[in-house]
Amino acid sequence: MYKDLKFPVLIVHRDIKADTVAGERVRGIAHELEQDGFSILSTASSAEGRIVASTHHGLACILVAAEGAGENQRLLQDVVELIRVARVRAPQLPIFALGEQVTIENAPAESMADLHQLRGILYLFEDTVPFLARQVARAARNYLAGLLPPFFRALVEHTAQSNYSWHTPGHGGGVAYRKSPVGQAFHQFFGENTLRSDLSVSVPELGSLLDHTGPLAEAEDRAARNFGADHTFFVINGTSTANKIVWHSMVGREDLVLVDRNCHKSILHSIIMTGAIPLYLTPERNELGIIGPIPLSEFSKQSIAAKIAASPLARGREPKVKLAVVTNSTYDGLCYNAELIKQTLGDSVEVLHFDEAWYAYAAFHEFYDGRYGMGTSRSEEGPLVFATHSTHKMLAAFSQASMIHVQDGGTRKLDVARFNEAFMMHISTSPQYGIIASLDVASAMMEGPAGRSLIQETFDEALSFRRALANVRQNLDRNDWWFGVWQPEQVEGTDQVGTHDWVLEPSADWHGFGDIAEDYVLLDPIKVTLTTPGLSAGGKLSEQGIPAAIVSRFLWERGLVVEKTGLYSFLVLFSMGITKGKWSTLVTELLEFKRCYDANLPLLDVLPSVAQAGGKRYNGVGLRDLSDAMHASYRDNATAKAMKRMYTVLPEVAMRPSEAYDKLVRGEVEAVPIARLEGRIAAVMLVPYPPGIPLIMPGERFTEATRSILDYLEFARTFERAFPGFDSDVHGLQHQDGPSGRCYTVECIKE
């Protein structure tokens, strides 16, 4: 199998190309290794060797010259540095020192901690070249044999055996694709290994995802250790499904559940599927439209009792909740002190579910200590804790690759057999093994110091990007405009991450969330929100402004897609896949936007897709003209304040979400135009994208108190007509074209 991996051996030796006996023997070792199937990378330069060792993360072994290093401080430092950089991402990589007579025997004591990581010293003149090469080959083979995590290793080994397939899938390891021209194209694009490793549950040596056996069970157990969980389960169809599994395993009909209103729609689907009665936790929201934290007081027994008393569906019930769910971190990168939430809830809930879809990396850096589900302490009265991760979002895994992590409570332990009934209800009996392997690899990549270094590198890139934006501002005229960064003032220009610097202080102006609890929430440095001119965090609108939708569209035209766009802010994510080249390109394009805006260049040149969508509407319109017109529309309609209002005032509850959905399924609903929605009960959820948070849930009533929702729907339609090319997306809002134009409707319960 080691030959299939094609991991080379790196040789760093000053005589590798020299006409010396030592050089000849080093080249002889390289030749023997090549004969054994290894490829060779070689250099005479220590500096180049360090670069290769630090950037080439697919090495089988390193041989480094160390003759006389004990007495030569510079040479010793070169050897030590190479060991350090190579071991950051590959802690078990075998590294041999090459010597002739004396190597590191006389090295100072302070270097020994690094030098002891050497696999050994090979003296070029003491043994035959073939013998020395075999020492290297054995160490490399052993390293590579133990490199792959359990499920991925079993999958690679099975694929390498080239077994004939008499089971599903029908393409038979890719053979069927080669019988058709379009199939041949598919085969060439995805490659032999991808198709040969697309297997079925009929292959027993890979274990079972549904029964958690074999190498698959080993992979889940290893992931549990890495993420700090008592149990971990691999999910192959996304965290939407992972959330439903958690709820179906823990929540029954008419159970009370405490729900973050800033939640993914899969949580709302879970409420419908289980028939639970929701009590909502309302997060803060600032004037910029950035979703803030749920006040800590919302988790207290008194607050829960008040919510039960206020709910027509729960009134009279004891203040005991089956499950509470919190989105951590928020879409905008606010991370809760999970320990504080757990303590405040006390024994009020049996199950605490952290939806950490965007936060799978938190366990691997001390910056996030105590701020993620599996990082909380245990107590006798503590709840059973679940964390659901979209591993594919921020770690290295295939799309739809997710995990469920579980921490047993003091007296509440996970009943694995009962849980697995819900797991099997939602997981395919024909799992995609490539997705499973990617979960196994994602977990293995984060083990030990290698995982921390990957997160630290992401921090470094995000901080460099933040500094680059600050540097541009400093070089502009004081009265000129530039993009802002939503962050604490004290972190501008910093190149180090300290948790205390990123914690939101109560009533600080920059965040706009008021008097939040001490040490309760921090801003994640790798989620960067950029602000555009026009609106302050306090809600003050300026005369001129640049709506963020225009900037995002400009970037999209140039192949840069941001994660989320608000009225005057947009979010960019720094994952492990972001490099200096990528964020430098973003800075360059932001500078280009400024140039085009300042020059008021025609939309036809800078936003051709918008110009095409608008036709005559945009004839003669420049980029600044469009920005001014859109800003005026937001200002005249007080859009920012209206959006804050519609998310902070909850609609009236009329029936359980599951009851409303039952009526939808039975056809006991009708399409109601926006103008006639007041007083009606919604049969569907209304979810604007972005941010993807529901305005109204099935079973909730449109009333005068939530008039801002109806105003927003009307405004969104008017806005689309005024600014073609900038369509709003509201899930649940339908339209019908008639003689008098387009009519927008919402499915409501028949009365």
Curated annotation (Swiss-Prot):
Induction: Transcriptionally regulated by ArgR in response to arginine but not lysine showing a tight connection of lysine catabolism to the arginine regulatory network.
KW Lyase (keyword) present: yes
Enzyme Commission number(s) of this protein: 4.1.1.18
Reactions catalysed according to its record: L-lysine + H(+) = cadaverine + CO2
Record CDD domains: Orn_deC_like
Stored InterPro entries: OKR_de-COase_N, Orn/lys/arg_de-COase, Orn/Lys/Arg_deCO2ase_major_dom, Prn/Lys/Arg_de-COase_C, Prn/Lys/Arg_de-COase_C_sf, PyrdxlP-dep_Trfase, PyrdxlP-dep_Trfase_major, PyrdxlP-dep_Trfase_small
UniProt keyword terms in alphabetical order: Decarboxylase, Lyase, Pyridoxal phosphate, Virulence
Quaternary assembly: Homodecamer.
Family indicated by similarity: Belongs to the Orn/Lys/Arg decarboxylase class-I family.
Name of this protein: Lysine decarboxylase LdcA
Organism: Pseudomonas aeruginosa (strain ATCC 15692 / DSM 22644 / CIP 104116 / JCM 14847 / LMG 12228 / 1C / PRS 101 / PAO1)
